Structure formats: C-alpha cells, structure tokens
Amino acid sequence: MIAKKIISPFAKTDLSDASKWYEKQQKDLGKRFLNEMKEAFEIICQTPTSFPIRYDDYRIYYTKTFPYSIHYQYIDYKNEIQIKAVFHTARNPQIWEQRIF
C-alpha cells in the first residue's frame, strides 16, 4: 500500500527556494527540479523502507539528476512518510539536523 505523504513547512521552503534558484539559472530548470522531486516522493511513498536510515529513524533518498537528498521519517503504524528536508548535498548537514533535534 502506498504511504501517505506529509511535507513539513521547512521542506516546502527548501523546495520553493531551490526551484526558484534553478529557474533563475535556466528557463524551465526549476520545473524540471520540481518534477524530479515529485517522482522521488512517489518512489519513497511506494517503498518507504527501501532507503537507508541516516539519523535515528530518519531515512535519506538521493535524487538522480540534481544534487539533493530528501530526509524523511516513515511512520509504519500510520503508513505515512513525513518529509523533513529537501537538502543540497553540498550544504552543511547540521543545518537540517537543527530542525529535528
């Protein structure tokens, strides 16, 4: 069964900021970024336990084209994923960790 997806306000801001930045770099690149994120969310929802646990019970999924990682929790008894961050892989991980710890 496909898991329900909840995107945190922080992750929504991450998505918005990144797509705007990519759109400024090249026309339609922001849209391509958002499309890849949508595909990634679908994959995570279909197979939420397939990706490694990185911190405590937070899992991480690395996108294919863009250098981003999606940090999420899978709540098994609710069959729900909670997306906490959409994070550029070159950024300091302590920034997103401060959101959850």
Regions found by a protein language model. Give the residues of each.
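Arg/Lys-rich, positively charged N-terminal/basic patches that mediate binding to nucleic acids
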Residues: 1-34
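Generic recognition of well-ordered alpha-helical segments
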Residues: 13, 17, 39-42, 46
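Short, hydrophobic secondary-structure boundary micro-motifs
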Residues: 31, 52-54, 95
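Basic/aromatic recognition patch in beta-strand/loop cores that engages polyanionic ligands
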Residues: 39, 46-80
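Enriched for short, Lys/Arg-rich terminal
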Residues: 73-101
